[in-house]
């Protein structure tokens, strides 16, 4: 019986995607939940990849100073955080945006310990995934050769 290598690899990558989402939630970084919604496993043909929103880099490693984020984004973030139980006044949007523009965001900080992705997708996990994927492909090739 031939193995479905892509299906087996998809199971591994789904677990990785789920572990990254769990890390995001465990670190208390959820505001709107968009990160979890936009964190996707995309499988097509013989390719698979995990995609995430652009701001994953800022969540992981911070944001450099220089440009103030749009006020509407900060207001939306405040509204989302307040739905999660925070009590941030909307009037704080401009001072927050100004501070981000002037100082950036350092990660880790008291609100974000960092490592939302790198704590999960660390060198040991990458090596383990490589070994598991190679094993899956190896057995799929052996199964295919045995069928013929």
Listing of model-derived features with the role each one plays in the protein:
Residues 1-42, 47:
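Charge-rich, low-complexity N-terminal segments
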Residues 34-148:
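Charged, low-complexity interaction tracts
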């Amino acid at each position: 019986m031939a193995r479905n290598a892509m299906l087996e690899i998809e199971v591994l990558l789904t677990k990785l995607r789920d572990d990254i989402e769990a890390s995001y939630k465990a670190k208390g970084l959820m505001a709107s939940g968009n990160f979890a919604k936009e964190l996707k496993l995309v499988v097509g043909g013989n390719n698979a990849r995990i995609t995430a929103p652009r701001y994953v880099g800022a969540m992981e490693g911070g944001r450099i100073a220089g440009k103030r984020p749009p006020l509407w984004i900060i207001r939306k973030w405040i509204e989302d955080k307040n739905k999660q139980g925070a009590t941030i006044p909307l009037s704080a949007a401009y001072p927050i945006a100004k501070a981000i523009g002037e100082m950036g965001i350092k990660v880790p900080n008291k609100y974000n310990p960092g490592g939302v992705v790198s704590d999960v997708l660390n060198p040991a996990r990458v090596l383990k995934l490589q070994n598991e994927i190679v094993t899956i492909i190896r057995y799929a090739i052996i199964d295919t050769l045995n069928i013929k």
